[in-house]
Swiss-Prot record:
GO biological process, one term: mismatch repair
Transcription regulation found in the keyword field: no
Keyword hit for DNA repair: yes
InterPro entries (UniProt xref): DNA_mismatch_repair_CS, DNA_mismatch_repair_MutL, DNA_mismatch_S5_2-like, HATPase_C_sf, MutL/Mlh/PMS, MutL/Mlh/Pms-like, MutL_C, MutL_C_dimsub
Protein name per its UniProtKB record: DNA mismatch repair protein MutL
Gene this chain is encoded by: mutL
Length: 512
């Protein structure tokens, strides 16, 4: 057979196969485009594990008609113009391959609108060929609908996994973005059912506690800066492990990466038995010019130009924070009733469901409230505000050194001190603090960290809250009123307090 040049259409199909391996990679590329378009709300919908449909909708900047027609061509991007831009890249996409690859191997519908345009542009593409361009209506943003992935590559189509496996991979890909982009409202829908709904939050670690539920059994959070590196994370206590690496998430400059080097550091510090792995969500921020992310089309492989420096910094941060010993044992009285005493009877129309949920009707939406989660948050805020904690005598002698302002604050929390000569001796501590944890606690206080103290307050609130299924009308009414006064979104552990559905969304669901 003679050597010949391949047709352009075949070249594009082959290239598409290198970027798009399965439906989860469609999710990845489209969500990255949404985030690069400055969206703060992203909805991912899949059908049949993404094999029949992947739809990603956002409220980003959108595209003009001219831009969308350019965007579906290979090696077109708004992210970079030169090699200098590539070295400093901060966006998710930059290769100009994603959308062009997707449209080559699917039936694609793109609807997009900029805030300047009166109407949206709709483009229908089949196997890379533009079939129709029209105008339609939608708010500013973009929806990309990808149907029948690999319909024109039957062998590739047949090689896709079962719908349940493909769904799991799509969900895991979605969760990778939800973990790092806490300021974005994320929704994941499978076959018409909402699987995840994450309202935007200012707390970076809330999502981790929702997605990685076993973290709630024991975790440590930290945020440190070493030289030109910033390292933040939420990691499991040593005794909380998994039999695999499914709880391991590394982010470099907000990009999810797979790194054996970082994994080795994690395992070295934890020093766990064979076939046991920690749960860890780690965020590393560094100068983009000290990274090479253009190694693989998927962009999930990264090379640090100063690898040893990064590894040493991560090891130092993990070692220091895992050395902290905190134990959870708290009992309080009267706080629960006092926390609710500030609320007036609710003026909203609402009703109690199963003695654990409140369904509330407002002018523009229905709210479904988890009363136990809300009660936890109310008590948590009350404890933070009032600082009413019982004390217990400390059996062993602990000497510390504190400035006057911290000494006064701690005394209000239930600590008691006594000067013996020039030494400051701790006599009493709040009930929640165990003997073993006292010295480490004071090290934290001296250096300004209160994170673990807040964690204990949250756990105390959990024990004080009325149990799910045991709420009466009076307590529920006060909680509903407090919800609309305070606008609480999460319980202290990070679980959602409420779910909101607008009447517009309700009409859309019933196809009105």
């Amino acid at each position: 057979m003679r050597i010949r040049r391949l047709p352009e259409s075949l070249i594009r199909k082959i290239a598409a196969g290198e970027v798009i391996h399965n439906p989860s990679f469609v999710v990845k590329e489209l969500v990255e485009n949404s985030l690069d378009a400055q969206a703060n709300r992203v909805v991912v919908e899949v059908e049949n594990g993404g094999k029949n449909l992947v739809r990603v909708s956002d409220n980003g900047t959108g595209m003009t008609k001219e831009e969308v027609l350019v965007a579906i061509e290979p090696h077109t991007t708004s992210k970079i113009e030169s090699e200098e831009d590539l070295r400093r890249i901060r966006t998710y996409g930059f290769r100009g391959e994603a959308l062009a690859s997707i449209v080559q191997v699917s039936r694609t519908r793109i609807v997009t609108k900029t805030k300047e345009d009166a109407l949206a542009t709709q483009v229908l593409i089949t196997g890379g060929k533009v079939e129709e361009i029209s105008e339609t209506h939608r708010d500013t943003g973009t929806t990309v609908e990808v149907k029948d992935l690999f319909f024109n590559l039957p062998v590739r189509r047949k090689s896709l996994k079962s719908s349940s496996i493909e769904l799991r991979m799509c969900r895991e890909m979605f969760e990778r973005f939800a973990l790092v982009k806490n300021n974005v409202d994320f929704t994941f829908i499978s076959d018409g059912k909402i699987i995840h709904s994450f309202p935007a939050t200012s707390d970076l670690f809330e999502r981790a506690l929702l997605i990685l539920e076993d973290l709630r059994k024991g975790y440590i959070t930290f945020e440190e800066e070493l030289s030109d590196l910033k390292i933040k994370g939420i990691v499991s206590a040593r005794e909380i492990t998994r039999p695999n690496r499914t709880g391991e998430y590394f982010y470099v400059n907000e990009r999810f990466v797979i790194s054996e080097e970082l994994h080795e550091v994690l395992m070295k510090v934890y020093d766990l038995p064979k076939r046991r792995y920690p749960i860890a969500v780690l965020f590393i921020e560094t100068d983009p010019e000290k990274l090479d992310i253009n190694i693989h089309p998927s962009k999930i492989v990264v090379r640090f130009l100063e690898e040893e420096k990064v590894k040493e910094a991560l090891e130092e941060v993990l070692t220091k924070n895992l050395a902290r010993k905190w134990y959870r044992s708290v009992t309080y009285e009267e706080i629960s009733s006092r926390a609710l005493s500030v609320a007036e009877p609710s003026s909203y129309r609402w009703f109690l469901v199963k003695k654990k949920y409140a369904v509330v009707e407002t002018e523009d939406a229905l709210f479904f409230i988890d009363l136990h989660a809300l009660h936890e948050r109310v008590i948590y805020e009350e404890i933070l505000a009032k600082r009413v904690w019982r004390s217990k005598n400390l059996k062993r002698r602990v000497i510390t050194s504190l400035p006057d302002e911290k000494l006064e604050k701690l005394e209000k929390l239930g600590f008691s001190f006594q000067f013996e000569g020039e030494s400051l001796v701790v006599r009493k501590v709040p009930e929640f603090l165990t003997e073993d944890a006292v010295e480490e606690f004071f090290k934290e206080i001296i250096h300004g960290s209160t994170e673990m103290l807040r964690e204990k307050i949250a756990l105390a609130a959990c024990k004080l809250a009325t149990r799910s299924g045991e709420f009466d009308e009076k307590t529920a009414s006060k909680l509903v009123d407090l919800y609309f006064q305070k606008k609480y979104e999460r319980c202290p552990h990070g679980r959602p307090v409420s779910f909101r559905i607008s009447y517009e969304d309700l009409d859309r669901f019933f196809e009105r």
